[in-house]
Amino acid sequence: DLQKGEGKYGVFGYGVPMGMGFGADEKNAKMNIFNIYQGGLTLGQREYYLDNDQTTADIRNAYKQFIVDMFKLFGFTEQQAQQKRDLIMRFETALALISKSQTELRDVEANYNKFTLKQFEADYPNIHLQQLCAAQGIQPQYIQEMIVGQPAFLAGLDKLLATQTADELRAYMEWDVINQAANYLSDDVRAVSFGFYSQTMRGAKEDQPRWKRATSQVEGMMGEALGRIYCEKYFPASSKKRMEELIGNLQVALTERIKAQTWMSEPTKKNALDKLAAFYVKVGYPNTWKDLSALTIDPQKSYYENMLSCVTFWSNEAIEKKAGKPVDRDEWHMTPQTVNAYYNPTTNEICFPAGILQYPFFDPKADDA
């Protein structure tokens, strides 16, 4: 029953001590595949639970008090909140012990392990994957093959799920819901959450005003829709065309440079030229804008309820567009108004959003040089 609950709330990212989702297969970049990877640590890194230097110990103690303070805000007594804290810390520390370090997670080969659903269910019988996925609207045919990032973590999690009490798992799920909902609830709840995450963890002095937080949330949930408005004002189609021409010229120049290199062998040159020719270039804004007509914001509902609606929309959209389907190379991983750029090695694409293509970085009237 608890895993049914994990699956239901997993749509919102609640209560599931592992990550799941669809993404490009790193060894077959044209297709999406189901991925499972370690997760479940509120503090993110295993060292916060296991290291004993003074700084880490102080953060861990502050985290324990944070848990108690939050549960009390939700109507639990001091004693009940402390009991919840102890159960949560026991479970998360057990997760930390089986988690890989950040350094280990950077090993691409070690974190790419292809499994069949049959193999997964045989190796991890206490992780009811089909049940978890069904609760999120993921059909079995889309998880017949998957990439398991950290098999040893899942083996440890499988044992934990077999030995942990219902009270421990329930407390962990309750905490995950409370913790992740905190920013969308009352000012009192938000203040306690800010005190730990922003002040204790990051050294911030004061919280942003509510209007800035709200603006940021609109950006996070409907960023591409805002980007469309931004581009209409600050990045016309003529600028997009100009930048695409400039990039094309750079590709031609780089092609000639590669051909002229005396230190490169002919097979190496061919591989370099093939990769350059295969670059997928994204400039300014998407050629096709996302359809957000099914995303409903209801002014009669609370901020939190509307946030859940947004998260559900994007979860369903990801499943619909990616489950069992080829990678959409036209999908953008940054909003047009973002002042940044990226290269995605899996899909061999470069992206320059309109936000970075402003003066002094880019001037459509300037000379190429």
Predicted regions located by residue number:
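Noncatalytic, helix-rich "gating/capping" subdomain that lines the substrate-entry/channel surface
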Residues: D1-E245, N249
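Intrinsically disordered, low-complexity linker/terminal regions across diverse proteins
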Residues: A94, K118, A122-N126, A135, ...
